[in-house]
């Protein structure tokens, strides 16, 4: 097969481009943010590869698959089936963890279900089989007169109608069964839903415990019959209501008398009722009423501080006031005393209950007061509507489940070992440690590692698969992750590398892989491993296309496609395509930075007059020295943080660095940000463990600026997000034409009826639903894509209709509204951040992550600064070209000049050079990280021998 040839691509801003991508090569697509890289790689190449593959399937199969729109391209030849590995997080599924995403969990369940050695959760001794005689002996110890029933399980959690099973039970002479917990005579069993899981137990015998020989004979016969019917398993239920006893010919503890089900892979699944912790349902965490949320303002007096009590109905408030008055009298505290000044022991009793110390009237009887948290829980349970219940959820936080300690599994599953390790212990290990563990037992698979007569020979293929998948995770630089880590806590870059490891594990050949910036989140140290993996993917006979800005990745690529010259309407052209050597000689913006003609490092870091530095005009960087005020967080121990204390100088530009997994996000995002959000905004998310936080009084706002979209619908656009669309509508409403017709500002909105085109609902396009084909969007024939009706478009401001103004670029609008100071100021901030090329009415869904981030920064710059704001950014250079990074640095330093504090998690060496203060965590990832290697200005980091970051600086 020949190369992949693209001719006449016009998706989004692509200008009828022709591109050649050599087959079985590693190709890098680069260019400015918004120049059309994703439009070419994902919306053209991947979309067409995926579409052609899906079209080859039957119409029946196609209806179940997401179908991609046909890209606007004249011809693509030589295309292979395409797989996109995008840089996105996993979504919010709380059950998704690293082990489930990589499918390692399935193999672990198979391993532990096949050769695991069960131990008693109470005493820890290995579980042994029980004979019928041992079971009878145990039951004979029941007190005389105890009524009990012997059940034999025949169906356990299986879907189906089970009609044949019920017929077989009747043939065997039994008359009663228990189906899904309810007991029926066999003739009266209701028809079972074949789509639902059911459990069926045969009622073998009903007995009353006595000491005569007839009872012993009957009990022995019933136990033997039950074991035969239930496949070696019986359940004995005490009619008095005690917990049922499970007896097994296969698994039982000789000392505690506890019996266990036979081990199966589902016993280790937290998504199955047979393996999940009964307390948290397999989630690993539970919601609880949090004292800090119930009493958000601890400076208020006792009579006013309990927030949910103050928001109850009039009668309830009177009742709770009476409770507080009695408590105050008995414990001799004043209702006017601020909550924070009450004794700690009293506060604990007030929240959690007074036991028998304090008895209060409660309906018809006197009861001890169970505490404020219990009363709020009851208020929630008794709420008459979902809306009322949701209000009480605001007082809840979540914490690890106290029953399973966050492991998600039931006690019996947590006590099963292979080679001395439980599945919980294996899942809690970093990937590199679990890889070493499984390689160790793989080497002695024929042995009996537990000394209990179980060899690992039957599962050597399972072990091989586990080792292979762990090896791929290790190779993509994720050796620090634990298998039980929640997917929602992973960054987009980590998630992408997990998907990459899964793809390499699949061993496919002849596939087109399209990746979106796989180096995101990687310290320069880890890049080499990733590049080696992409080469391995290529060498197997696949074509790998990578959207990337990393110079090292470009240097090792076989082919480079450079788009430009600008972004948005000014981009979309191929500036260069060919090998690395040719790019260095090309006249493109990318080449200017790669060969040193331009540099990101600024001339003056203290000034907002931030120009790109020429190589022959290199000047030293002048940093802003830290002042006397610091934000100091002490004793951080969440995840792998080793009890560290970190100082952030206020009013400076601080960069947090360290290799992947060193604890950067844990420190800044999970600990510092969450605690500040709780203190300033009463947010619910619990912060990571730390001892103290000082200096918060010097901060009045915390703003996180990420690369998430500014809106997820076609109606969202820069004009509505930054907030000047309402100003434009006001201007139109003041024109003579609008006044004569009685139009207000609402007439010029495409979100409300009146001025918008009702045929398309103000979208400008109409969706045509095609059975078995992807939906097609066509320009609205009524308004011609202009969104407004004819009457609204007749009103002009400065000779332009509202639709014509929304079609302008930001730069054009800035010139047009130059004499409207309020509007011009907001538009100028967008021009200053390098977004003069985007359209005012451009759909938010077409903006890149870098563009969305710069719009958010422009919005912040357009607001009046208090000089006490803390800005948090996690890897803001994601998706940014060298030139975009220079613009971003100018913006961040502008925020700093207003007296604000900017904290950035970043691996980009040029960003580190511009920092006033660097906090370097490490020295490694996972267990080898979590230490403060050094902190201080860049010079101090350079001189620190232990710092990997210092070497790259």
Indicate where each model-derived feature is located:
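Conserved phosphate-binding elements of NTP-dependent enzyme cores
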Residues: 1-953
